[in-house]
Swiss-Prot record:
Belongs to the MSDIN fungal toxin family. There is a cross-link at residues 11-17 (Cyclopeptide (Ser-Pro)). This is MSDIN-like toxin proprotein 3. It comes from the Eukaryota.
Amino acid sequence: MSDINATRLPSFFFPIPCISDDIEMVLTRGER
């Protein structure tokens, strides 16, 4: 999932896959 999130999100905004995973989870929870 880290690679997928890194690809979906801007690499310059989320350079670290771990951070992108955390933000992805937050965005998913906010949308639902």
